[in-house]
Amino acid sequence: MIPGELELVQKSLAGDLEAWGEIVRRYKEAVYGVSVAILRNRADAEDAVQEAFIRAYERLHRYDLSRKFSTWLFTVAANVAKNMLRKRRRQDPPAKLHYAPDPAEAVWKEEVEQAVREAVWSLPEAYRAPMVLRYWHELDLSEISQVLGIRPGTVKTRLHRGRALVRARLAQRGVIRDVV
């Protein structure tokens, strides 16, 4: 746990809204990252963040204090986002998103980073979510496993396949040379 985190959780359990506000401030960006990785839509992700923090607060009594709080919170956020995605898929036909590169990006490093982001965002959710959690939020395999509700071996496989797909897409765009 982050220093003072256990104390903040305990105060929140006792009804201290200022303590809960501090938890929200500490984790809102990471929860947003989890949500946008699943939903691929910033507006929906913002809604999911609010809903995730509401649900987490309502269910805080279910949190096991011996476990890592961020993993529990990211699991709540992932579940909220997945539910929103299922609901959206029932209501709307799937739409393809197009991410055009920013013409102002003249530096090669920025172009490569943009190309990598686009390649990751174009992955199917099964590969995209583990990639974002691992490489943007630096979660380990067991944490990703808990957040997504899949086995660690499945996480490992999806990360491997996700990296292979990203490499192939970057090679196809000429950003990197395809390595056997």
PLM region spans:
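Residues within the DNA-recognition helix of helix-turn-helix
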Residues: 27, 48, 158-161, 165
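Structural recognition of an alpha-helix C-terminal capping motif at a helix-to-coil junction
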Residues: 33, 47-54, 67-79
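Sigma70-family region 2
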Residues: 13-14, 40-41, 51-68, 87-90
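Amphipathic, Lys/Arg- and hydrophobic-enriched alpha-helical face
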Residues: 24-42, 59, 120, 140, ...
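C-terminal edge and immediately downstream basic/flexible tail or linker adjoining helix-turn-helix-like DNA-binding
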Residues: 11, 97, 104, 108-110, ...
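Short, charged helix-capping/linker segments at alpha-helix termini
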Residues: 13-22, 32-51, 152, 175-180
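Arg/Lys-rich amphipathic alpha helix in sigma70-family domain 2
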Residues: 58-65, 75-95, 109, 161
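A short pre-motif secondary-structure segment
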Residues: 130-134
